[in-house]
Amino acid sequence: QDLPGNDNSTATLCLGHHAVPNGTLVKTITNDQIEVTNATELVQSSSTGKICNNPHRILDGIDCTLIDALLGDPHCDGFQNETWDLFVERSKAFSNCYPYDVPDYASLRSLVASSGTLEFITEGFTWTEVTQNGGSNACKRGPGSGFFSRLNWLTKSGSTYPVLNVTMPNNDNFDKLYIWGVHHPSTNQEQTSLYVQASGRVTVSTRRSQQTIIPNIGSRPWVRGQSSRISIYWTIVKPGDVLVINSNGNLIAPRGYFKMRTGKSSIMRSDAPIDTCISECITPNGSIPNDKPFQNVNKITYGACPKYVKQNTLKLATGMRNVPEKQT
């Protein structure tokens, strides 16, 4: 359309829409391949390859699992009373103390991880007429035999092992986590040489719960020179409740309690390096930006993260349909 000017000249006004030589293909409800002039990617599909240590407090487990740090494996002593937002377990982590099992390992691991602390308070349990602080060459602490620092292995004193009955009230206003265990000797001879009785028993109770464990005597596969095992259990004592421990043998006693906290702490298995940087969202692959609404890096996340989707790409059309001019 020609428009007259004040000086009798004319100007040309072109009516149409913007087009670009190379548009972006997007999916719509009715068509898988629509070309538009511009589109924004909504899916974060890559990580930085490293875990940022800010703003979250990251605790690198190095060669210790969270449970080994909890029990006090000698090579994990550096984790005593530590705190974290996210505990990172490494594939190279290993146990280096008396061989043990935890019947409900995942639940204990999750419970401690969410608490975000290994804060430990020693208590004055009274164990009479038994020998305390048992150790083993399977658990070296320095040059000599040792044991888990948070547990107390009780054995006979002389030729006696009396029935033990100990109570410990919770007079504080927070939950207390007690870790204890039961020793399973490999032979009947080992059983009587340590505990006198041919069959031991351990009962741990509160007003809300009771657990009774009978040791299973028998040889297991050799681990660090031992064919015996220890089973690890735990009890939570609420404020105003009381812990009661009754045993006539095979007791691996607590030395105190872990102070339980409520929060959003967690645990993650990852071999990504930890670096000085800032990122709100962490995955096992590394930290990722959270400036997109979706991500397909990993289902497992910690922090303020985009929602996980299976799609590699989702685009939001921010321009019109692209119809480039055809030259003939």
Curated annotation (Swiss-Prot):
Localization (cell): Virion membrane; Host apical cell membrane
Coiled-coil residue spans: none
Keywords annotated in UniProt: Clathrin- and caveolin-independent endocytosis of virus by host, Clathrin-mediated endocytosis of virus by host, Disulfide bond, Fusion of virus membrane with host endosomal membrane, Fusion of virus membrane with host membrane, Glycoprotein, Hemagglutinin, Host cell membrane, Host membrane, Host-virus interaction, Lipoprotein, Membrane, Palmitate, Transmembrane, Viral attachment to host cell, Viral envelope protein, Viral penetration into host cytoplasm, Virion, Virus endocytosis by host, Virus entry into host cell
One GO location term (cellular component): viral envelope
Glycan attachment residues as annotated in the record: N8, N22, N38, N81, N165, N285
Xref: InterPro entries: Capsid_hemagglutn, Hemagglutn_HA1_a/b_dom_sf, Hemagglutn_influenz_A, Hemagglutn_influenz_A/B
Post-translational modification (record): In natural infection, inactive HA is matured into HA1 and HA2 outside the cell by one or more trypsin-like, arginine-specific endoprotease secreted by the bronchial epithelial cells. One identified protease that may be involved in this process is secreted in lungs by club cells.
SUPFAM superfamilies registered for this protein in UniProt: Viral protein domain (SSF49818)
Pfam family, one: Hemagglutinin
Top-level taxon in the UniProt lineage: Viruses
Leader peptide range in chain numbering: none
One GO MF term: host cell surface receptor binding
Membrane topology: Single-pass type I membrane protein
UniProt keyword Ubl conjugation present: no
GO BP annotations listed: clathrin-dependent endocytosis of virus by host cell; fusion of virus membrane with host endosome membrane; fusion of virus membrane with host plasma membrane; virion attachment to host cell
Disulfide bonds: C52-C277, C64-C76, C97-C139, C281-C305
Function: Binds to sialic acid-containing receptors on the cell surface, bringing about the attachment of the virus particle to the cell. This attachment induces virion internalization of about two third of the virus particles through clathrin-dependent endocytosis and about one third through a clathrin- and caveolin-independent pathway. Plays a major role in the determination of host range restriction and virulence. Class I viral fusion protein.
Subunit organization: Homotrimer of disulfide-linked HA1-HA2.
Any further remark recorded for this protein: Major glycoprotein, comprises over 80% of the envelope proteins present in virus particle.
Family: Belongs to the influenza viruses hemagglutinin family.
Identification of the protein by name: Hemagglutinin
Organism in which the protein naturally occurs: Influenza A virus (strain A/Qu/7/1970 H3N2)
Gene: HA
